[in-house]
């Protein structure tokens, strides 16, 4: 990818001459879609990023959000970040995914925080295809290797399979960091005369041009031709960098910081000084390297991993070098900050190779004004399938099957904060410093947003909010990773615009500020574009660290809240469902609750009540899959659903309208009272010790023992 003619003319007009080779490469990368958001930034103003809890919102390496404290708890902040490593994970699934983890962890470090939790949201082609399974295995291995080695637990996430990811999988990784308020730093340069210090791994040639590579469609030969653009990670160096960063903060040696990610040293250093309104003079010869004969462009743009650039006061430079040596990390004093109004200058072998205004380099790219086509609306055209066949196919589909094969590879209890483990609706982390439980949910459903981008994205936000509420937490803040195909195609851009608006509207309705995020476009290949995919990572807060489990106790009554179709008030729709993915057909997307905020807040309140023995949200696969996930060898369930004027048994059991939760409770009347005027409460039956699941709808019955259900749900384990 090279600088376009129009961009080249703009650069020449601004700087008054032809750019040097190094300058042209910098503009090419920093003005790429990956860095400049040229096609997406005009849409992102739809998001509400403000709130009393927001300390630092979008624009930095990670967002900073304050937590409520309980009891004798202290004031604490968390950082939230998310990034994509999509193209690299197709070319090299292990290293592509591993370095995605490393990058988002360093974004956390650059705010002064210590990383305490990861979430991975993964999207692949049809599970039946060998190439999809190869990518799946490699990505999971890369994430588990890197996360386990650095001691950061992967506690939640999602996995989805869809034909349209065959030529371009998605790997979205989110990180939560814990931060004492007084340790907060930013990526905004502070003071002329301060030094720029590069700490971490030596610089090589890996990852060259990674930002521009991520801004193009994947070519047919990408797995071989684009391998040099994929970074190679070293988690052991990352662990040392994490601890070195803590030591630097302990001694208050850091004025500002930036992770070296997209566009490498050139991107990190120019962005840092631009945010501070300063200039800089950098000597590229001073960069510690691991390969000989590197040129200026390679020093600037290599995306070698495990590197940070720090702003350090001159009197503190020697101490920073001592601490870096203690942790066996390289350290180079590469330059210094200069007065406002001066340029970003880089020299190499005594010659000036870059001399430009950092603000123009970082923010001068013109935005794209692209046409968009609204996605077509789908109408009902559904096949007739027996209830047993539908249940077995859907419960055993990779999208609804157990993901234990994935999360059992992760060390999800390191740091001893995880009180609700992977496999539940949301993870729950004990923030003992504040006396606060932090619920964490992340994911999206491509079936939803493929069928209806706007409505599906609203459902993604509601589902993640319902996940944390089902564990008794109130939604607090979110970050998003917006993935789309080639925005130059009007139908693709129309779908992308739909997910942006849908996610923004529902988060606003829920009063959840979207405090940061990432955009990944050009996820397109010879197989076509991906479905528009709005990954959301959302946290909720509660007092204490206990939550009702997903699994039944076998001792209570079962109720579902928010299921208006079972009450005969709405038409159950199968649009975007696993039912239509398995059997074909189309339908409209489910209508969502009118007042989602009241529903979610009441779910959180009820989930924390003493009479609640278990809780589980209803979403992927519908009510039947939710019940199948709740039964186990020690507890079964008997469910009977009466006749309604709306919906066949299949539509009642397999529609995926979010905002519903199944509670096992010893006091159904208390649940009904809590939801009076908020959402309907429908009694389903009882949990018991029958070792089976019986569901009767309109005189049709499903009857399975839990061993058979476990066998159906083990398809990923069985295959891999």
Curated annotation (Swiss-Prot):
CDD domains: PurL_repeat1 (cd02203), PurL_repeat2 (cd02204). The keyword Disulfide bond does not apply. One of its GO terms (biological process) is 'de novo' IMP biosynthetic process. This is Phosphoribosylformylglycinamidine synthase subunit PurL. GO terms for cellular component: cytoplasm. Disulfide bonds: none annotated. Mg(2+) 1 binds at residues 83, 518. It comes from the Archaea. The keyword Ligase applies. GO terms for molecular function: ATP binding; magnesium ion binding; phosphoribosylformylglycinamidine synthase activity. Part of the phosphoribosylformylglycinamidine synthase complex involved in the purines biosynthetic pathway. Catalyzes the ATP-dependent conversion of formylglycinamide ribonucleotide (FGAR) and glutamine to yield formylglycinamidine ribonucleotide (FGAM) and glutamate. The FGAM synthase complex is composed of three subunits. PurQ produces an ammonia molecule by converting glutamine to glutamate. PurL transfers the ammonia molecule to FGAR to form FGAM in an ATP-dependent manner. Pfam families: AIRS, AIRS_C, FGAR-AT_linker. Its main location: cytoplasm. Substrate binds at residues 84-87, 106, 231, 303-305, 520. ATP binds at residues 37, 480, 517. Mg(2+) 2 binds at residues 107, 259. It comes from Haloarcula marismortui (strain ATCC 43049 / DSM 3752 / JCM 8966 / VKM B-1809).
